[in-house]
Amino acid sequence: MFWSILAVLFVVPLVALYFVVIRSVDRYMPEPWWLLFLCLVWGAVGAVVPSVVGGLLGQEALASALNPQHTEQGVKLVENTAATFLAPLIEEPAKALGLLAIYFFSRRRVHETHGPLSGMVYGGIIGLGFTFTEDILYIVGAAEQVGAAGFFGVYFLRTILLGLGHATFTAFTGLGFGLFVTSQSGWRWAMPLFGLLLAMMAHGGRNLFSSFLALEGAGILFALMIHGLVVVLFFSLLVWLGFRDRS
């Protein structure tokens, strides 16, 4: 209980900061607070539940398929495979369901124009909700294993250095939904799927370098580089779309 409370106290301020930064980009036609709150709740609860269940079932299936030896290397093989290939395939669609619900709901009830910028903001907030719950689970797990060193090590890596990861991934899916709403192209139906594919690729690529390719820390460095590039792209798109909507 102590580690859980401490994790919440440490994670909440950063998630709140990320929330304010993402929302502040869309000042011209800001999304309603209640809808952003629902996005946060979906990411923190709605998307986490199927992700955890699917992840556990998937790891069991991988363990049966790979049939690793009951050694540290065998366990690591299953964990790395799940992180690189399984997690993106489960977590990104789970988060995308929130965006799908927003689209169908807002068609009838919300009158704001949900274009690419709004889609990225909604996706980013859903991702932050997911980060909130996932980071607490990982931080508490590390603390229970190795104490304070595990707590602060995982907190620094996941919440500070990689804290915007899920927000950027799901924002790509949101961009696809936003383009679907505003585009007149015959390919508009494929745009949410393309955004989801980008989200899964970015997610899997980052996890690849932090798992299979984590060679004496080099993989972590590359993971941080990929994360940094994705975050720069994320905010560049947000700013550009924000200026475009004002003009």
Label the predicted regions.
Residues 1-247:
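Hydrophobic alpha-helical segments at protein termini of multi-pass membrane proteins
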